[in-house]
Amino acid sequence: MSAVPQPPTPPRTPPPLPRRIRLKLKRIYLDLTGPRVEREWRRTWSLIDPIEGWLMEGQDRWLFDTAYSLPSPANIVEIGSFKGRSTCFLASGCRGTGKRVFAIDTFNGNDCDFGYRDFFEEFSQNVNRCGLSEYVQPVVGTSSDVAKTWNKPVHLLFIDGSHRYEDVLSDFDGFFPHVAPGGIVALHDVSEAWPGPLRAWHEIAKHRLVDVSHCLSLAYGRKPASGTA
């Protein structure tokens, strides 16, 4: 008597992957298939986030997106760079283009706001580690001295140096004539905690700009296309 054939054993369903592995695979998939700007941002943030600085959440992405949106070539002037956190977010938006960030700072701090002096070496190490050296030109000196001999058009001006009212105003007045019509001007720390930038923005800067807006304590606008403001 012949044996009765048995139905084939159904394949065993593999157990689900742990959540952390599924998330990692999702990130890899997005890195390979997502929009280029999103891929660049994810790579940018993980490299730059360890750098010390005072940007609020969301302002890092604003700097990156704004630099990324500029046509190439373009000149970005940053006044106040410290250890390079904001510098690197700006420069990451320049990767693969002819855009450049001019990072103006004494890199020596002061006795009031910093616990130590001379952080140029750490700034340089951070920029190099992020692979952004070709997009960053450090300009060592006071912003007022640099403004006296500046001769390049500026397409994005980011003011985040001394927060004394007179100094913020000096930075604005010194570089605003070089901002190209339609160029962007941004001031950091426009908040009640910092009366200098707050006063300079509300009394002077915002009245010389159009399309003004805020990203938390970062206030910005565009120089009128006519260049008459």
Predicted feature residues:
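S-adenosylmethionine/decaboxylated-SAM
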Residues: E38-W41, W45-D49, D60-A229
